[in-house]
From Swiss-Prot:
Location in the cell: Membrane
EC numbers for this chain: 1.14.-.-
Regulation: induction: By iron deficiency.
Domain of life of the native organism: Eukaryota
Binding site for heme: 451
Organism this protein belongs to: Arabidopsis thaliana (Mouse-ear cress)
Membrane topology: Single-pass membrane protein
The name this protein goes by in its record: Cytochrome P450 82C3
Keywords in alphabetical order: Heme, Iron, Membrane, Metal-binding, Monooxygenase, Oxidoreductase, Transmembrane, Transmembrane helix
Any one Gene Ontology cellular component term annotated for this protein: membrane
GO MF terms, alphabetically ordered: heme binding; iron ion binding; monooxygenase activity; oxidoreductase activity, acting on paired donors, with incorporation or reduction of molecular oxygen
Length: 512
């Protein structure tokens, strides 16, 4: 009897000990630090400033105080903000799959809902190196035509003195034409008969729709903060998003129908001259049939994504690059001297020359570091509970990675706010690439939601900058410094026009 009681007593002690041991070993829930001052209902929304606030700078200042991993409550939505390359690496490697889902109001109504499948198709069929090589003539000819437009303006103004141009607008038109031709075989802006063509009204509608798209995507709506209140549409933004989508759909539908008619006329002799043709061929081969939407919706999705991906980002990067050079005249002279040494002044710069223009490549990298087109990587949500940088991130938490802050980290970059292209040649960043493998420099993002077209973007940036700097002397009016103010929005764009004086530095034959 005593033995049985003793055994029972020992068993109870062992059970209690095991239970207490397990409890002590159970990981504690650790939440990333949160700024003080959260209000009931709205949380930290009031700390982010108004519509003119540069959100990436505001979040950067918060990171200085609260650390590189931070929690925010934006309405009813929990948000995790990462502001160091270590946190970014944790997000885009170990937790890339867990943090790969988000549908904001803008994405829901304007980005379509099956972008992942279409991204795979675009990467394989549209943005491969082979396909980009086939479309190389479009990129080169549009840059040549853009340079010719500037030269023609100089001639029209007398052909003897420097003329003033708004380079920001010129770059936007040139890149838009380039992408539009690749996607739909259309040229909307500038010379070459674009403005006098039958598509003038369509071009106006398209530009208006794209501008409205970027404006709406940059707006933080009530439903983004309070998803359950989205049906109320208190601000009317969701209604406007749907209307903008319909307006763009009308034009996209017209493109597809025009291509179908052209293919009927050409019969079996048609070739896949642009992305719409490629997608129509895929549809005819049944390669889009496994998707949940019809072929037209698939094609419109891909076309819109490709156009939006480059229509604002690439011209913005070139605008910043030229602005930085104008404020650093010794560097402007250095890169023009480099081009003259490797190319001379008896021919135009070609793609094959870029590999020798090391300083020019460094200028593009340094510009992308200081002014990443997408300063905040968002549109992600935790699909499951995960741990980032030692902090618990519950399912449903939204993720923001502050690329702007990461790329100005003084622990990585010496004098991080200074324009120093040399850092990518012989300095601390000489081994950094821009394609998302080095988390200290990721202007195109990283992981599953990174930009699918960095190769095309870098080709446009390198040749576009090289051709302009080789073709023209450029300076500001009265040699004034360029205003480097940034405009609030989805991308980092220059707040003011880039008005400069240009003068040809090559012989006439190279412009005609």
């Amino acid at each position: 009897m005593d033995t049985s009681l003793f055994s029972l007593f020992v068993s109870i002690l062992v059970f209690v000990f095991i239970a207490l041991f397990k409890k002590s070993k159970k990981p504690k829930y650790v939440k990333a630090p949160a700024p003080s001052g959260a209000w009931p209902i709205i949380g930290h929304l009031h700390l982010l400033g108004g519509k003119e606030q540069l959100l990436y700078r505001t979040l950067g200042k918060m990171a200085d105080h609260y650390g590189p991993a931070m929690s925010l409550r934006l309405g009813s939505s929990e948000t995790f903000v990462g502001s160091s390359f270590e946190v970014a690496k944790d997000c885009f490697t170990v937790n890339d799959k867990a943090l790969a889902s988000l549908m904001t109001a803008a994405a829901k109504h304007m980005g379509y809902v099956f972008w992942l499948e279409m991204r795979k198709i675009a990467m394989i069929e549209l943005l491969s190196n082979r396909r980009l090589q086939m479309l190389n003539n479009v990129r080169v000819s549009e840059i040549s035509m853009g340079v010719k437009d500037l030269y023609s303006l100089w001639v029209k103004k007398g052909g003897s003195e420097p003329v003033m141009v708004d380079l920001k607008s010129w770059l936007e038109d040139m890149i838009a034409n380039m992408i539009m031709r690749m996607v739909a075989g259309k040229r909307y802006f500038g010379g070459g008969g674009a403005e006098s063509s039958e598509h003038t009204e369509e071009a106006r509608q398209w530009r208006k729709g794209i501008a409205k798209f970027f404006h709406l995507v940059g707006i933080f709506t009530v439903s983004d903060a309070f998803p359950k209140l989205g049906w109320l549409d208190l601000q009317g933004h969701e209604k406007e998003m749907k209307q903008t989508r319909r307006e763009l759909d009308v034009i996209l539908e017209r493109w597809i129908e025009n291509h179908r008619q052209q293919r009927k006329v050409s019969g079996t002799k048609h070739n896949d001259s642009d992305f719409v043709d490629v997608m129509l061929s895929l549809a005819e081969q049944g390669k889009l049939s496994h998707l949940q939407y019809d072929a037209n919706t698939c094609i419109k999705t891909t076309c819109l994504a490709l156009i939006l991906g480059g229509s604002e980002t690439s011209p913005s990067t070139l605008t910043w690059a030229i602005s930085l050079l104008l404020n650093n005249k010794d560097m402007l002279k250095k890169v023009q001297d480099e081009i003259d040494i490797h190319v001379g002044r008896d021919r135009n710069v070609e793609d094959s020359d870029i590999k020798n223009l090391v300083y020019l490549q460094a200028i593009i990298k340094e510009t992308l570091r200081l002014y990443p087109a997408a300063p905040l990587l968002g549109h992600r949500e935790a699909m499951e509970d995960c741990t980032v940088a030692g902090y618990n991130v519950p399912c449903g938490t939204r993720l923001i990675v502050n690329v702007w802050k990461i790329q100005r980290d003084p622990k990585v970059y010496m004098e991080p706010n200074e324009f120093r292209p040399e850092r990518f040649i012989t300095g601390e960043a000489k081994d950094f690439d821009v394609r998302g493998q080095n988390f200290e420099l990721m202007p195109f993002g990283s992981g599953r939601r990174s930009c699918p077209g960095p190769s095309l973007a870098m080709q446009m940036l390198h040749l576009g900058l090289a051709r302009f700097l080789h073709s023209f002397e450029v300076k500001t009016v009265l040699d004034r410094p360029v205003d480097m103010s940034e405009s609030p929005g989805l991308t980092i764009t220059k707040a003011t026009p880039l008005e400069v004086l240009i003068n040809p530095r090559l012989k006439r034959e190279l412009f005609v």
